C-alpha cells in the first residue's frame, strides 16, 4: 500500500472517530427537549434551592448525552438511562405527583431511576394508566424511598418488559400485589422491603413470577406459616429475603427445592422448631441468616461444613432453648467465612472451628455463657477483623495483642472484666471507631493513650469503677469522637481540661461521677454538642448563659450544687426537648417568655424557685415538674401547651381555685397539685381529661419524640458476597437512654414511672389543700384513672356512688375530710383496688364486705365512730344504725364532729383549771387544809425515798 493511500485511510479513520465521538456527545433533539421539560416540571414542584438539576441540563447545551443523570446508547445516540434521584433535598410540601407523559419521548429507555423523589403518585394525561407500556425496552425501574401507595400499581402492570422493579421504602399496604404485577412475567428482581404489606403470600399466583431470581420482602408485616404459602414455586430464586416480618412455624421442607439459592435471610420472624437438615444441601449458599427467631433443639455446625461458598452465617434464638453442638467439624469448615454471628445460642465455649478461620471480618458471640480470659487468639488469627462483639458473657481478664490495625468495632460490655485497662490500649486499638466497655468492673484511671485514638467515634465506659481525672488531651486527641458516655464511675476533677473546636463531639454523658468545679467555658469549643448530661456530680457555681448558644436537644445538670437564677437563654434553644435542672439550689423566677416550640420535658423540681408559673411555656411541652419549690400565685391555664401530659406542682405555695380551663387538656394523664393552698370546689369538668370518658386515643401512645430516643450508628463493612439487591451492612443501635422518671404517690408510697409504665399511669392528686364542697359525681367517669387522692381537704357530702365506675382504680384516698353518709356497697365491684382510705370523716353504717374490701384493715376506717362491722371492733348488733341522711342538709354539723369534740374537751379542761386557780387565791380554812395535805404528802414521799 502506497504512503498516499495509507494517509487517506488514516484521515478517513480519524474523521469517522471524530464523528462517532461527537455522536456520543449529542442526542436527538426531541429527547433533549423532553429532558428540559422534565427539569422545568421538577423545579416547579420542588423548590429546594440546592437541587443540583438546576445547575445542569442547560438549554444552551445541545449535547445532552454528557449531562449528569443521563446515559445514551453509544451508536444510536438515544437516551437509555435517566436518573432523577433527589435524595439530598428536603421533602417538599405538599408532596407532588409525577406526570408520566414526560417520559414517552424516550422510546429506547432501558433504566429509569425515580428514587428519593418524594413523589406521592402518578398521573397520565395522554394514555391513562397504560403509558409505561409504550416504553418497550424498559428493564429497570427504581421507585424506592418515595411516598407511593397502591394507586401506582396499575401503571406498573403495563411495563411488561421490566426485569428489575424496586419499590422499597414507600407507603404500600395490603396483601402481596400479585394481581397488579401479573403481567410482569420477565421480572427477575423484585424489591418490596420497608413497606406495610401484610397478610399471607399467595399460593398459586406467584407462578406468574417464575423467572424471579431475587425477592426482598423484608421489613413488612407478612404473616402466617411459610408451609402454606406459594413462595416455594419460585424455584429459580437465588436471593430470598424475608426478615423482619411475622412469619411463624417451621422452615418448610419445600425450601429444599431452592438449589440455586445464594442468599437466604429469615431473621427477625417467629419461626420455631428445629433448624432443618437440608440447609447442608445449599451448595451455592453465600449468605445465610437465621437470627432472632424462636428456634430450639440441637443445631450441629456440621450442617454448614460442606457449604464451600458460604461467607456469612448468622444464628440466634429468642427461645433460650437452642443449643449448638460441634459434630463433624473436627477439621473446620470447608469455607473461609467473612462474618459469623452466634448470639443467644447458649454457647459455653468458643466453637473450635474458629481456630481454622483466618479471614473473618465480623465475629459476634454475644449473649452467651462464655467465660474465662479474653480470647486474644481471635484477634491474632484474623488480622483483617473489623468487628468483635462479645457483650453479655462472663469473660474476666482483658489482654490484647500487640496491634490490631484493622479493628473498628469492639464491644465487651456486660461481662466480668475487673482489671485495669492496658496502658497502651489506645495505641493497640488505633483504628477503633466504636468501643463499648460498659457494665463491667474495670478499675483505675483512663489510660492517657486513649487520648490518641484519632478514629474513635463512639466510646462507652459507663457503669465501671474507673476513677481519677480524665486524660488532659481526651477532647483534642480524639477529634473524631461524636458519642462519649462515662456515667456511673468515680471520675473526678474538672469535666474538660482542654478542648478544641475541631472536635466533632455531639453527645456528652458524664452523669453519676464526682466531677467538681464550675461548668467550664472550654465546652464552648465543642460547638456541635446536642446532648449534655452532667447530672449527679458535685458541680458548683451558676449555670452559664452561653449554654443557650448551643443547638442542644438534651440538657441535664440535675442533682449538683448549682446556685443562682436560670438563664432565660435556655428556654430559647430551638430544638431543646429535655431540660432537667432539678435537685440544685437555683433561685429566682421562671422566664415569662419562651421562643422554643420544641420542648417536651421541663424538670425543675427540688429547687428554690419563686414567683408565679407563666402561661407561656413551651408549646410542645409534655411533662412539667415543678415540685418542691416556693412558687406562688394561681395555677396557670396552660393555654400555650395544649399537648401537656404530666403536670407536677406539689409542695409549693399555689393559691386560688383549680381553673376550669384545665379541663381542655385532652392529653393529661397525671395531675399532682398536692400540698398547696388551693381552695373552692373541684370542677366537675375534669371528666374531660384523657384518663376519663372524654380522653383522646393518643393518650395511649408513647409521647416521647421517637426520633430522639436513640442514637443510631451504622458502620458499613466491605461487601463479602455478591448480591442482586443490596450488600450486607453491619449496624449498631445504641439507645441514648435518659430514663426520664416521674414520681407519683400511689398506694401510700411514691413510685417512679418511666417510658412504658409512664404510658400506663393515670393519676389525680389534690391532697393537702383547702378544697371544699361536694365531690363531683362526674369523677366517677374517670374510668382509666389508677390513683385518686383527695385526702386532707374540707370536702363534704357523701362518697359518690359513681365511684363504682372507676374500674382501673388501684388507690383511693378520701381520708381527713368531712364526708358523711354510708360507704357505697357498689365499691366492692372495684377489683383492682389495693388501697382504700376513708379514715377521719363522719361516715356511718355498715362497712361493705367482699372481694377487695376483705383485704382492708382497720386503719382504713379510723375516726369514723359510727361505722360498724369488720374490720372494726364495733358490732352492728342487729340494730338499725343511722345512715346519716338527717345530716345531709347541714354539712357543717355532724353528729360527732371530731373538731367540735376536741374543742369541747379543751374548753372544759381550761375552765376547770381556771376555777382551781381562783379557788387557791382565797385565804380560807379550806385553802390552808389543802396546803397541809400537800405538805404531808411530800414528807411521806421523802421518808420513803430515804428508806430506799
Swiss-Prot record:
Database matches in InterPro entries: DNA_repair-toleration, Leu-rich_rpt, Leu-rich_rpt_typical-subtyp, LRR_dom_sf, LRR_N_plant-typ, LRR_PRU1-like
Protein source organism: Arabidopsis thaliana (Mouse-ear cress)
Identification of the protein by name: Receptor-like protein 45
One protein family per Pfam: LRR_1
UniProt record similarity statement: Belongs to the RLP family.
UniProt membrane topology term: Single-pass type I membrane protein
Organism ancestry: Eukaryota, Viridiplantae, Streptophyta, Embryophyta, Tracheophyta
Extracellular topological domain residue ranges: 27-897
Gene (name only): RLP45
Keyword entries, A-Z: Cell membrane, Glycoprotein, Leucine-rich repeat, Membrane, Receptor, Repeat, Signal, Transmembrane, Transmembrane helix
Signal peptide positions (record): 1-26
Main location: membrane
Glycosylation sites: 99, 113, 183, 328, 381, 392, 436, 465, 608, 653, 679, 688, 789, 837, 842
Coiled-coil segments: none
Intervals holding LRR repeats: 106-129, 135-162, 163-183, 184-208, 210-233, 234-257, 258-284, 286-306, 307-332, 334-357, 358-381, 382-404, 405-429, 430-453, 454-477, 479-502, 503-526, 527-549, 550-573, 575-595, 596-618, 619-640, 642-665, 666-689, 758-782, 783-805, 807-831, 833-855
Record topological domains on the Cytoplasmic side: 919-948
GO CC annotation, single: plasma membrane
Transmembrane intervals: 898-918
Superkingdom, taxonomy of origin: Eukaryota
